């Protein structure tokens, strides 16, 4: 992109700066539009499962409800508690929002449709996603209130616990694909299952890892049945209790952007990314980014369905599941997959 702006007569510094801003906008604007749509889908799915209609007034079929809510919170007053640490209190939602957007830079939406196609893309996503807990801890501490503080401590313990098992699961994928590059991981899944299925989910060794990864994503994003950081009956609204206006909205945008990010990682790592489900020539006439969007939104639908139907875990059950079930299982499969690859000589 820098070369394109240089052809317009800009020197290298201005071309690089303009290309960087353009790249940020190319990622941020579509992600924000997608977040607005998935919030609408989330509310519609919850309404349907609860035998309600969901949003249906603002715009056709209620499609503009998210934009109306965004305008409402934008016009509201930002209220800061008198005992709060003002600087950190206002910085926390910004950190959560920015971290959720930055990780999208390496996600391939299609063949060549990636902002930064780096060789350590998976490692980058893992590192960036683990920073999201800082915004939550900052919010809980700066609010100077017991409910947000308890929520922040829960969030920190929960995210750290499941990051470990997610790390081992991703090692399994990297061992099989032979690369950290997300685009190359997608290409490695072409015709992987019986020579016709595009995706690692068909692999008898990697399918259990996908199940663990999907459940870990629910815990990582604090979604039901692991939404203990926002347990209304215990913690009011959790770390968001003292927030209002755009500060509250930034937390919501960051939360849903992070959910979409992990849904897209499910697509890229286990379900063939932009590749069609079956390696059949007519299916390749459908643009790759459409396959990517369809798979990602199907995963988001699963998130919403689980949120509406599965009861919340107790906190001790959550910790036990992470440390006594997921961690040993993921570590066991690292050894199993490593042994299989060494025995068969199959790498990448």
UniProtKB/Swiss-Prot annotation:
Annotated GO MF terms: NADH dehydrogenase activity; oxidoreductase activity, acting on NAD(P)H, quinone or similar compound as acceptor; quinone binding
Lineage top rank: taxon: Bacteria
GO BP terms: aerobic respiration
Residue ranges of the TM segments: 21-41, 87-107, 120-140, 166-186, 195-215, 258-278, 288-308, 325-345
The reaction(s) this protein catalyses: a quinone + NADH + 5 H(+)(in) = a quinol + NAD(+) + 4 H(+)(out)
GO cellular component: plasma membrane
Coiled-coil ranges per UniProt: none
Keyword Nucleotidyltransferase: no
InterPro entries: NADH_UbQ_OxRdtase_su1/FPO, NADH_UbQ_OxRdtase_su1_CS
EC number in record: 7.1.1.-
Localization per record: Cell inner membrane
Keywords for this protein: Cell inner membrane, Cell membrane, Membrane, NAD, Quinone, Translocase, Transmembrane, Transmembrane helix, Ubiquinone
Classification via PANTHER family: NADH DEHYDROGENASE SUBUNIT 1, NADH-UBIQUINONE OXIDOREDUCTASE CHAIN 1
Function: NDH-1 shuttles electrons from NADH, via FMN and iron-sulfur (Fe-S) centers, to quinones in the respiratory chain. The immediate electron acceptor for the enzyme in this species is believed to be ubiquinone. Couples the redox reaction to proton translocation (for every two electrons transferred, four hydrogen ions are translocated across the cytoplasmic membrane), and thus conserves the redox energy in a proton gradient. This subunit may bind ubiquinone.
HAMAP family to which the protein is assigned, alphabetical: NDH1_NuoH
Annotated family: Belongs to the complex I subunit 1 family.
Name recorded for this polypeptide: NADH-quinone oxidoreductase subunit H
Species lineage: Bacteria, Pseudomonadati, Pseudomonadota, Alphaproteobacteria, Sphingomonadales
């Amino acid at each position: 992109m820098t070369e394109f702006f240089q052809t317009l007569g800009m020197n290298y510094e201005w071309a690089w700066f303009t290309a960087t801003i353009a790249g940020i906008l190319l990622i941020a604007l579509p992600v924000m539009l997608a977040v607005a749509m998935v919030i609408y889908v989330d509310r519609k799915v919850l309404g349907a499962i609860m035998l309600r209609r969901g949003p249906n007034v603002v715009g056709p079929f209620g499609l503009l409800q998210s934009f109306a809510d965004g305008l409402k919170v934008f016009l509201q007053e930002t209220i800061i508690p008198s005992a709060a640490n003002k600087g950190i209190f206002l910085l926390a939602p910004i950190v959560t929002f920015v971290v959720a957007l930055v990780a999208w830079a390496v996600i391939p939406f299609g063949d060549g449709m990636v902002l930064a196609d780096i060789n350590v893309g998976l490692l980058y996503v893992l590192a960036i996603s683990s920073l999201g807990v800082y915004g939550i801890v900052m919010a809980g501490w700066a609010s100077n209130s017991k409910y947000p503080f308890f929520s922040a401590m829960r969030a920190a313990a929960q995210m750290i616990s499941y990051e470990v098992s997610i790390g081992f699961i991703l090692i399994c994928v990297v061992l099989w694909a032979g690369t950290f590059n997300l685009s190359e991981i997608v290409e490695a899944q072409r015709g992987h299952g019986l020579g016709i299925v595009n995706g690692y989910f068909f692999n008898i060794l990697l399918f259990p890892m996908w199940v663990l990864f999907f459940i870990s994503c629910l815990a990582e994003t604090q979604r039901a049945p692991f939404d203990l950081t926002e347990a209304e009956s215990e913690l009011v609204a959790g770390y968001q209790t003292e927030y209002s206006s755009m500060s509250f909205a930034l937390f919501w945008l960051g939360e849903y952007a992070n959910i979409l990010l992990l849904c897209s990682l499910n697509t890229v790592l286990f379900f063939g990314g932009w590749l069609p489900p079956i390696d059949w020539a007519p299916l390749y006439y459908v643009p790759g980014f459409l396959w990517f969007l369809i798979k990602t939104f199907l995963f988001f639908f699963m998130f919403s369905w689980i949120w509406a139907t599965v009861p919340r875990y107790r906190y001790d059950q959550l910790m036990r599941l992470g440390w006594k079930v997921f961690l040993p299982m993921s570590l066991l499969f690292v050894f199993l997959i490593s042994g299989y690859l060494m025995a068969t000589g199959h790498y990448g």
